[in-house]
Amino acid sequence: SAAASAARRARLLNLLFARSSAAAAASAAASAGAGSGSGGFGLGSRFLGGGRGGSRAAASAVASAGASARGGGGGGGGSSSAAAAAAAAAAAARNANLRGWLVASGVGAGAGAGAGAGAGAGAGAGAGAGGGSGGGGGGGSGSGGSGGSGGSGGSGGNDGNDGNDGSSSRGVKLYAYDYYKDDKKGSND
């Protein structure tokens, strides 16, 4: 059915987002040892009840990456950490925007809303502290399909002429001109 198909699609999308969030967190955690700066970023989603949007989380991550690069314990290490953190921030922003679009359009709103929970990573300190949990799932209601439109009626056949006076000799008069011809014929007789 349509409801089962929508639920299946929602589960697959939420699984995809969960894996993407986990990959972003792992990338940020791996880059934490390269720089010695402090900071971190969390993935917030205003669509799942969080107070911050994806763009704010991305901006925070870029700022954190810059601080990590400035305070890094080596030129190569700091730039590597900044690049990895920036890539993780971009992935987090894309995740938040896609999830927001799906929730706003009603796709996957009721299945596993917590799959996109924030994944933060503290640069230089080791493991980062993750952000918030997702909001509870709401039941998705589907609207019924619209009824089909009725077929158009067939057009009537043309009246035949008898070849003498040009008036209709059979059939139902469908047009005002038929009446006009008969009236005119009667007035001339």
UniProtKB/Swiss-Prot annotation:
Residues 127-170 are annotated as: Disordered. The keyword Transferase does not apply. Residues 127-160 have a biased composition (Gly residues). One of its GO terms (cellular component) is extracellular region. Keywords: Secreted. It is found in: Secreted. Component of the organic matrix of calcified shell layers like nacre and prisms. This is Alanine and glycine-rich protein. The lineage of its organism: Eukaryota, Metazoa, Spiralia, Lophotrochozoa, Mollusca.
